Curated annotation (Swiss-Prot):
Compartments where found: Preautophagosomal structure membrane; Vacuole membrane
Domain notes: Coiled-Coils at the N-terminal half are essential for autophagy.
GO annotation, cellular component aspect: endosome; lytic vacuole; phagophore assembly site membrane; protein-containing complex; vacuolar membrane
Protein name: Autophagy-related protein 14
Length: 457
């Protein structure tokens, strides 16, 4: 309430008494409390007076009600006392548990303090011990890998010598001829001048030694090679997409005799058909008479050269310029460098860079058969990215164009006996007319018989 004299609201703590209104306002709460106490006192006096004024004895119902109230009060008091006792016991147990935990925590702190003394030194010592053991294991693994690489190198050299792989210098100082099994290694760019028997035999020898070497080196060639076996006595090779697929492959002889009912998926069989590594006819004649077989054969020999180049790169053997078709298709030189001359073969700049970084890629290290230097691991994958070979299909197209452009054009065309029937009939008819005009009674002469004629240019 506002003061009528000073016109301000009353605040008992912050504002002092300046007038009677402020004093009255300060006493207002106390007066209210006094009035309430007086009213309560009057009520109690009235109750006492009523009890004293009762002259009659209490009735039975009144006694029963009072006894019931007494029993209720006693029961409630008992419950309250039991709850109080239970609460005291809980408090006592909690205090004991707190004391036990404090004692355990104190012991743990003392133990931690005792253990923490010299913890850093022990940790450093343990770390050095683990690093030393790890280094020893790595050294042993590296030593075993080096011994395995030397063993692989020895096996490859021995296999090459047993197969008769050698290099013979030709007329020019930089030209070499490579022999395997006593016959020259086929030159892909000069197959037009080679006989079918020599080409097939040379490719068969290359397949056999390449499979043996891949077994020694524990590497999986990109294009799967199938050696002669019971179902098919000729070597074949699969393209990159169809290699190492589950299921039985369809060889050319099996595809020719298979019935349409047994062929469930023609497209899958076409994809999984192996490429032949043999020919029965001269290459120029095969290209003219059977272009499909010619294309399959060119693709097969290109895949074989691709396998050799890929094996050289995985073993750190240089093949020259990977972009040049001549370096990729030179199977004799690449095979000789891989098996015999791999220790002294020239290294490409990527290999020299790896050696400068301390990561040498020596012969026989990387393979698919060991976890150390595994070609499928992270380190092997990074190593595989250092060399990038051109696609075998592009190489096959280049080889096909080169062979077709260099195919010899014959000056003589071989004809069978049926081709001369028309000319003989024409010659006989002209001779009969001539005899009739001349009146010659002798038997007519037949035309000159032969088996070839000059081809018109």
């Amino acid at each position: 309430m506002d003061c009528d004299i000073c016109h301000r609201s009353h605040d008992a703590k912050r504002l002092p008494f300046l007038c009677t209104v402020d004093a009255r306002a300060a006493l207002y709460d106390g007066r209210i409390e006094n009035v309430m106490a007086l009213i309560e006192n009057e009520d109690l006096q009235k109750q006492i007076s009523d009890l004293l004024d009762e002259t009659n004895a209490p009735t039975k119902d009144r006694k029963d009600a009072l006894q019931a109230q007494q029993r209720t009060a006693e029961d409630r008091t008992t419950q309250i006392l039991a709850a109080a006792d239970k609460l005291r016991n809980d408090i006592k147990a909690a205090k004991e548990e707190i004391q036990t935990r404090r004692a355990a925590l104190s012991r743990r702190k003392s133990d931690i303090a005792a253990v923490s003394d010299g913890l850093i030194e022990r940790r450093v010592k343990r770390q050095k011990s683990v690093e030393r053991e790890t280094g020893m294991h790595k050294y042993r693994w590296t030593k075993c890998a080096d011994e395995l690489a030397r063993t692989r190198s020895f096996l490859c050299i021995e296999a090459a010598q047993l197969y008769g792989l050698k290099r013979i210098k030709e007329g020019s100082p930089s030209k070499y001829e490579y022999y395997l099994g006593g016959i020259p290694v086929v030159d892909l760019t000069a197959m037009n001048s080679s006989t079918p028997e020599m080409i097939s035999t040379s490719l068969s020898h290359i397949c056999q030694i390449l499979i043996l070497v891949s077994h020694y080196l524990s590497i999986r060639l990109p294009a799967a090679i199938t050696l002669p076996h019971r179902d098919y006595p000729r070597p074949t090779i699969f393209n990159l997409s169809a290699s190492y697929r589950p299921g039985d492959p369809v060889f050319p002889s099996q595809a020719s005799v298979s019935s349409p009912s047994s062929t469930t998926d023609t497209e899958s069989q076409r994809v999984s058909r192996p490429r032949p590594l043999f020919i029965d006819k001269p290459l120029s004649q095969l290209a003219k008479e059977d272009p499909a077989t010619f294309s399959y054969f060119i693709e097969g020999v290109t895949l074989l050269a691709y396998n050799i180049a890929w094996a050289c790169n995985t073993q750190g053997v240089s093949i020259g310029d990977k972009a040049l078709f001549e370096d990729m298709s030179n199977m004799g030189r690449n095979l000789y460098n891989l098996l015999i001359n791999h220790q002294s073969a020239g290294k490409d700049p990527d290999t020299l860079k790896n050696e400068a970084d301390g990561q040498t890629s020596r012969f026989g290290q990387y393979s698919h058969g060991t976890t150390f230097y595994h070609l499928g691991g992270a380190e092997g994958t990074e190593f595989s990215k250092t060399f990038k070979l051109p696609s075998p299909m592009k190489l096959a197209d280049k080889l096909k164009k080169k062979l077709l452009s260099e195919a010899p054009t014959p000056d003589w065309e071989v004809l069978d006996d049926d081709a001369w029937k028309v000319e003989e009939e024409l010659a006989d008819g002209s001779q009969v007319n001539k005899n009739l005009l001349m009146g010659d009674k002798s038997s007519p002469r037949r035309g000159t018989s032969g088996w070839m004629r000059v081809k018109n240019r």
